[in-house]
């Protein structure tokens, strides 16, 4: 006689020590923890103490630090636990090969590309929080998902919102997708004021608690630019179907407009656990301890058209999508170098977009990527060219 109880789902979390990873473990705990889920792999970077605590408490079978120099520290932290330890690129690829039904891909940057692609090819369901997979290697990644047979479950709040309201049998009737943005700390700033922005003022996001780099990317709208490129790949859209609207309350996370004039939207309090929980439980909806909206208290929702003069990153996203090929990888690579220079005080806030566009123009001749080597080459060339331009002082 069978009890009817299903076996625990096997999960891996790439980037468990970051914000997305920590929230994922929080959601797993709320949804029954070890009774319903079996953690195969956790990966992190330099925070080995947190990674070790997570591995012990979750019962993970393998813990991986992306940095080889932290291998011995992680090994000491997990001594006697029975949890296997690995490190570096080979460790991340070992993590990708482990038997997990569902993978949270939350490693920040290009380091997450290879292991996430490998997990997709293996057929795992990919809960995607790594932007580079689609921005830099969108065509290759979508192909890997299709060949592997797994599902692609977006975790970014905007893309998760679209995923939730998208009527699968009505994709042909999609007229536009509208990504919302809070507008960040400089939504009402003048162009002159934005010329004098510092890293400290740029990090103050009005609605979300985030790290330094992502906060600055949000303030400059580069984060939204990357999300536009992601949306194109996720939902097979044309560039002219993707719009951005400022919505300072961050209650509507995105909208889908159809050919009959209908617009469907997903609303909710700004809490990443909603998107994570939906990706983890899809197609069911889990019960989560997140804030419930009180529309009487909310009273109003505001919207504004973004100004591409003050936020040129949005225009660069359209340029990258129109050109196609490896322009997404070039945009991202150049932006990363410009962002570091801004944080260090070597580059003005608005000059991040100037240098990124110059690099995109200089490398517009690069052919489409036939494989990951071409993606990494485009990224490397973009970073080198951005550094050269700053050294030559060709931008502000």
UniProtKB/Swiss-Prot annotation:
Binding positions (NADPH): 17-20, 47, 130, 132, 211
Catalysed transformations (reactions): 2-C-methyl-D-erythritol 4-phosphate + NADP(+) = 1-deoxy-D-xylulose 5-phosphate + NADPH + H(+)
Transport as UniProt keyword: no
Family (UniProt): Belongs to the DXR family.
Database matches in SUPFAM superfamilies: 1-deoxy-D-xylulose-5-phosphate reductoisomerase, C-terminal domain (SSF69055), Glyceraldehyde-3-phosphate dehydrogenase-like, C-terminal domain (SSF55347), NAD(P)-binding Rossmann-fold domains (SSF51735)
UniProt keyword list: Isoprene biosynthesis, Manganese, Metal-binding, NADP, Oxidoreductase
Positions contributing to 1-deoxy-D-xylulose 5-phosphate binding: 131, 157-158, 182, 205, 218, 223-224, 227
UniProt pathway: Isoprenoid biosynthesis; isopentenyl diphosphate biosynthesis via DXP pathway; isopentenyl diphosphate from 1-deoxy-D-xylulose 5-phosphate: step 1/6
Matching HAMAP family: DXP_reductoisom
Xref: PANTHER family: 1-DEOXY-D-XYLULOSE 5-PHOSPHATE REDUCTOISOMERASE, 1-DEOXY-D-XYLULOSE 5-PHOSPHATE REDUCTOISOMERASE, CHLOROPLASTIC
EC number: 1.1.1.267
Cofactor: Mg(2+); Mn(2+)
Name of this protein: 1-deoxy-D-xylulose 5-phosphate reductoisomerase
Organism in which the protein naturally occurs: Rhizobium etli (strain ATCC 51251 / DSM 11541 / JCM 21823 / NBRC 15573 / CFN 42)
GO MF assignments: 1-deoxy-D-xylulose-5-phosphate reductoisomerase activity; manganese ion binding; NADPH binding
Cited Gene3D superfamilies: 1.10.1740.10, NAD(P)-binding Rossmann-like Domain
Function: Catalyzes the NADPH-dependent rearrangement and reduction of 1-deoxy-D-xylulose-5-phosphate (DXP) to 2-C-methyl-D-erythritol 4-phosphate (MEP).
GO biological process terms, semicolon-separated: isopentenyl diphosphate biosynthetic process, methylerythritol 4-phosphate pathway involved in terpenoid biosynthetic process
Pfam hit, one: DXP_reductoisom
Positions of Mn(2+) binding: 156, 158, 227
């Amino acid at each position: 006689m069978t009890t009817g109880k299903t076996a625990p789902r096997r999960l891996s979390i790439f980037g468990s020590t970051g914000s997305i990873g920590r929230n994922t473990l929080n959601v797993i705990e709320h949804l029954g923890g070890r009774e319903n889920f079996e953690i195969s792999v956790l990966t992190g970077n330099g925070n080995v103490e947190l990674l070790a605590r997570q591995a012990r408490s979750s019962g993970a079978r393998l813990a991986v630090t992306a940095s080889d120099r932290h291998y011995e520290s992680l090994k000491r932290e997990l001594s006697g636990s029975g949890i296997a330890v690995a490190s570096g690129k080979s460790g991340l690829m070992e993590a990708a090969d482990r038997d997990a039904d569902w993978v949270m891909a939350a490693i920040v940057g290009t380091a997450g590309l290879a292991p996430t692609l490998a997990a997709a090819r293996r057929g795992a369901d990919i809960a995607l929080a790594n932007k580079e997979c689609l921005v830099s290697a969108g065509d290759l990644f979508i192909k890997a998902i299709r060949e592997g047979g797994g599902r692609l479950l977006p975790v970014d709040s905007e893309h998760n919102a679209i995923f939730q309201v998208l009527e699968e049998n009505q994709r042909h009737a999609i007229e536009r997708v509208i990504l919302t943005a809070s507008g960040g700390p400089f939504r009402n700033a003048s162009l002159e004021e934005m010329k004098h922005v510092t890293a400290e003022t740029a990090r103050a996001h009005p609605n979300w608690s985030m790290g330094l780099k992502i906060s600055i990317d949000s303030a400059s709208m580069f984060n939204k630019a990357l999300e536009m490129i992601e949306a194109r790949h996720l939902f097979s859209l044309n560039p002219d179907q993707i719009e951005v609207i400022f919505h300072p309350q961050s209650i509507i996370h995105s909208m889908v407009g159809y050919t009959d004039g209908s617009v469907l939207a997903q609303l909710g309090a700004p809490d990443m656990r909603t998107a994570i929980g939906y990706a983890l439980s899809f197609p069911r909806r889990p019960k989560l301890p997140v804030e419930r909206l009180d529309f009487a208290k909310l009273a109003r929702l505001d919207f504004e058209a973004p100004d591409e003069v003050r936020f040129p990153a949005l225009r660069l996203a359209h340029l990258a999508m129109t050109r196609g090929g490896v322009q997404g990888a070039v945009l991202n690579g150049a932006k990363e170098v410009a962002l570091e220079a801004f944080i260090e005080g070597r580059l003005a806030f608005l000059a991040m977009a100037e240098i990124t566009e110059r690099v995109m123009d200089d490398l517009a001749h690069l052919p489409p990527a036939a494989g990951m080597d071409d993606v990494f080459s485009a990224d490397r060339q973009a970073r080198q060219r951005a550094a050269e331009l700053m050294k030559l002082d060709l931008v502000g």
